[in-house]
Amino acid sequence: MAVGKNKRLSKGKKGLKKRVQDPFSRKDEYLVKAPSTFAVRDVGKTIVNRTTGLKNANDSLKGRIFEVSLADLQNDQAHSFRKIKLRVDEVQGKNCLTNFHGMDFTSDKLRSLVRKWQSLIEANVTVKTTDDYLVRLFAIAFTKRRSFQVKKTTYARSSQIRAIRKKMVEIIQREASSRTLTQLTKLVPEVIGREIEKATRGIYPLQNVHIRKVKLLKQPKFDLGGLLALHGEASTDDKGQKVEREFTEQVLESV
């Protein structure tokens, strides 16, 4: 006969049941702020463990990267296929001040652009901006039918593709190397693509010309003043103002 423990006979509780603590009770919420170049500044909220001992909450927040749709940042659904990466560089109070970290296309948009009977032309350029950011820009373009064309296909010759790629590289280098990173983020969505389309019209007509990706390779030494100016929080006058006040000599009543 097997001898086992009778579950009906309990000897009593050995100890009280441990109290389960809510993990979110030890966390704080911080507001993520986008640079002033975007129409919408409030990106969202992020949580982090509260500062305890040597573990500082600010250190945990710095370097976090958030991926946000450009349509939400600009209140324009035409940019819904562009994803902007923002990196936390500074924490002030309950606000996380971010800077541009990169841009990419959604996978469904890229797949919708690739079609039959046309040539795909790609180019990538590594450029240093005027404020010493090293970025790599990836461009994409597709050939389209001419107005008088009867043939169904729009394949470009190898020599034409090389000439178009050369023009793409020249335009991207010219536009990116003469501007700051902030100015470049404004040009990336539409302006550079239109410039490429206009310049290559004589070689072969193009359509769907975009900067599909921007990758940040290297950034300069962190500048707090520059970041605050980017967020519109830097004071216009850094110098103190002189206060006009009459000098009154204090007389000691007792020595």
Swiss-Prot record:
Keywords: Acetylation, Cytoplasm, Ribonucleoprotein, Ribosomal protein. GO terms for biological process: translation. GO terms for molecular function: structural constituent of ribosome. Residues 1-20 are annotated as: Disordered. Residues 1-18 have a biased composition (Basic residues). It is found in: Cytoplasm. The modification N-acetylalanine is found at residue 2. Its main location: cytoplasm. The keyword Acetylation applies. The keyword Metal-binding does not apply. GO terms for cellular component: cytosolic small ribosomal subunit. Component of the small ribosomal subunit. Mature ribosomes consist of a small (40S) and a large (60S) subunit. The 40S subunit contains about 33 different proteins and 1 molecule of RNA (18S). The 60S subunit contains about 49 different proteins and 3 molecules of RNA (25S, 5.8S and 5S). Belongs to the eukaryotic ribosomal protein eS1 family. This is Small ribosomal subunit protein eS1. The gene is RPS1.
